[in-house]
Amino acid sequence: MTTAQQLAMKGCHNFRAGIWKPRTKPGGFEGNGEKALPWLQRVKKETGMLVSTEVATPEHVELALKYDIDILWVGARTSANPFAMQALADSLQGVDVPVFVKNPVNPDLELWIGALERINQAGVKRLGAIHRGFSSYDKKIYRNMPMWQIPIELKRRIPSLPIICDPSHIGGRRELIAPLCQQAMDLGFEGLIVESHCSPDEAWSDAKQQVTPDVLDYILSLLVIRDEKTTVEGIQTLRKQIDELDNELMNLLAKRMRVCREIGQYKKEHNMTVLQTNRYNEILEKRGAQGALCGLSAKSVASIFEEIHEESVRQQLEIINQ
């Protein structure tokens, strides 16, 4: 209650708490279950905030609705399982409650969209998505890799879908929350879900990624909220330049692929394999060096030429197998 009261005083409108917490391994804190639902009722009554919790089974849905939980969300482990999602969707038939769906643990946009569609087809119209990052072996900086291109593509495909960001789970460390919050706002996310605790180091789960209500209030006060819809003449001129450059790029790629097909024909006539590893490594090395001189990241350059090479191989295989 102390945390809830402090957050309400800071102007927060929605209090989210995990009643059931699926853990990667057994033995950790997995939530207090049904006995904690009256605690959320008390938060709602005493602070006026809306309350929300995660549901993973039809039984969770039934109990959450029984205790008048205002908003439900589906966690990353559940959204990755179509069987679990369909069971949740069936339990939500005819229920008028907002539902947010977190991205699956693995970076699979179609799986995320499928989870959202199942809930929507159950008749839930107040639907949103939560971006909490994606699991990766590389945890040098983030607990979960942001991979911003995936929620951006989700927004492109479903423009009306509200998407909020969970910087706590992406960062995994409290010092990363502020910059991640700002990046989410810069990308046009509709909101944030940030973990807070009156005594973060004493939290029963994910203590390292929690901040006090005072720190949260300070982080939010520093956010720069940009106007997505404001367009000035200057940016339209620059966008026209981008369009012209993109046209040039497409023409150059088409020309490159024509040469690749000629190479494919040569390989066929001389009984050569399509994949020439030494040549591919040479291209990556040279283009990476060129990219660095042009101010491009090595990762971006490698990614671009990996895609180009994949398309080249595909077209050459077609020629060889004709």
Label for each model-derived stretch:
Residues 16-35, 198-207, 263-272:
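Glycine-rich, proline-tolerant flexible connector loops at the mouths of alpha/beta enzymes
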Residues 84-218, 222, 227-233:
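Catalytic alpha/beta core domains of metabolic enzymes, predominantly
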